[in-house]
Amino acid sequence: MKRSSLVWYVAVACLGGSLCVGSVVQADSPKTVKASSIVPTTVTTQMEQAALKQKQQYQAETETMGLLWMRTSAEYRALAYQGYNVAMNLVKMAVADPSHQRKPLAIVLDADETVVDNTKLMGESIANGNGRFDAPWWRQAVHQGKSQAMPGAVEFLNEVHKQGVEIFYVSNRYAPVNYDATVQNFKELGFPSVDKDHVLLFEKDSDKQPRFDAIAKKYSVVLYMGDNAGDFPIGTKGKTLAERNGIIDAHKEDFGTTFVVFPNPAYGSWVSALAKGYLC
C-alpha cells in the first residue's frame, strides 16, 4: 500500500470514524480533494488542472498526518496543558509585579487551536474528501459553532479572569459571518469576557497588529498566546520562510516569558510561506 493511501485510511478511521466509508474506498482517487471548487479560474488547460490537483492532494495528505497527531496524540494534549501552565505562571508573576500597575493588565489570545480545538471538524472534512482548510471553508466550519475547548483552556481563562486581568480574543475569524456564532460558542464553552469589546475578529485587515496596538493603548499586555507567528506583535505577516525564522530568532527571549506558542502542524501561515496561494 502506498504511504499516501495509508495516510488517508488512518485519518478517516481515526478522524472521521464510520461517517465516510466511501471516502476510504476512493482514497487513491483525485476526487479525494474536491479540486473543482478550488481550482482558480485562470487555470485553463487540463494539464495545468491535473498538476494543481496533484499538488493540492499531496499537501492535503501531508497535513492529514499533522492533524492526526493533533487529534489523537497524548503529546499534543500535554503540550496544551504545558502552554497553559506556563501562561498561568506568567500571569501570576505579572499580577504580583508592581511595575505592571501603571495600566490595567491584559492578555491577548488567538482563538483557533489556541483556546478552541477544531480538529474534529477538520477530521470530518478530510474524511468527506476535503483537505484544504482555506478561508471559505473556515467561515463555513466555525459558523456551525461546534468548536471544542482546548485542554486546559476553560480553567486557565477563568482563573485569569479571577485575577482581574482583561482577556482579549484576537482572531482572524471573519466578523461579518462568524461573530455571532463565535460569541455563542465561546459562551457555551464557559469562556469569560465574551463580548464585543473583548472578541476582536477580522473585519477589513487580517493583520492583527492594528488590533494589538489598540489594546496596548489602554492596557499593559503581559502575555500573547497563539499557534501562528502572526498571533504575536512581531511583524511576520507576508514574510518569506527565511524572514519569518529570522524574526523569531530576533525575539527568542520573548518566548516563554511574554509569548506562549501552541503547536499546529496542520495549517497556518507557514503553509502559505511554502506554497503561495494555498492557504491564507
What are these regions (language model features)?
Residues A106-D110, V116-D117, E166-S171, L200, ...:
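Structural recognition of the beta-strand scaffold that forms the well-ordered cores
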Residues W69-A80, R139-S147, F168-A175, L200-F202:
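Second-shell loop/turn segments in exported
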Residues D97-P104, V115-S147:
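Active-site neighborhood of HAD-like aspartate-dependent phosphohydrolases
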Residues K2-S5, V12-C14, S18-L109, A273-C280:
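Non-catalytic pre-domain segments flanking phosphatase-related domains
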Residues E113, A153-F186:
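Substrate-recognition element of Asp-dependent hydrolases with the DxDx(T/V) motif
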Residues L90-D97, M122, F156-E166, N185-P192, ...:
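Structured segments of extracytoplasmic/periplasmic soluble domains
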